[in-house]
Amino acid sequence: YNKVKDSGYSCCILKGQGNAVMYPNPLIRIPGDVDVWVNAVRDEIRSLAHSLAENANGHVDDESFNHVGLTVNGITVELHTTPGFMANFVYNRRLQRWLKLNVDEQCSNMVALPNDAGLVAVPTHSFNVVYQLYHLYHHYFYEGVGLRQVVDYYFVVTMLNVECEMLSSLQSELKHLGLWKFAGAMMYVLHKVMGLTEDKMIAPMNAKRGQMLLDDILNGGNFGHYDKHHVLGHNLLRLYRDARLLRYYPAEALSEPIFRVWHFLWRVLNKKFS
């Protein structure tokens, strides 16, 4: 975080390390890689990744539509040009617009790390309640949702003081971004797994979608490692997942195969001209 800041870019730490500060004991949460949202254009982030890797005897790993990956001191880091994307082009356009409107506030929301490790910028609770719901939705389609992510989102929701006017605005935002149906499923999961009470919920529970989501979480886990269909291979597993989710989330399920082709072409062209 400090090295990115010292390079002249505003940024914030997404998910993992930022979520840990919400836990009663932040040290009990085991983080994965480090996700950094950098307020800069792609070429600047690409140059930054190479600079950070060279200065730490690391290496740049990969580049996708929303991040440049690198390894420094044995730690996997993703520098995000944008913290997310959706397969449906209409909802993705809305999501990108929403993210751009919120980036400055997130990069200036400073919190103290445990054990006097310093200050870092992390997203606000009001941002996270939408963004991390999106992130769960993305994992549901592409990789699988793990219980750690469910626990994270429980703390995000319970930390939010939702007033009637704010709740109405939040629900409108979720509908605008195509996350409303999934929000109902997630509230059901949080109620069943974590005992979330209805007065804390950001949407009405949907038992049918929620039970399907919970079954997938218990059977597959994060990144779908325990899914019995994992033997199908990455692409066939995605098609299988799209087919299952088509009934409940048609906009994203129908768009995902098209987006996958677009993303493949984007990678080819971007690699050619980068």
Predicted regions and their residues:
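Conserved NTP-donor binding/palm subdomain of two-metal-ion nucleotidyltransferases/polymerases, i.e.
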Residues: Y1-G32, V38-S274
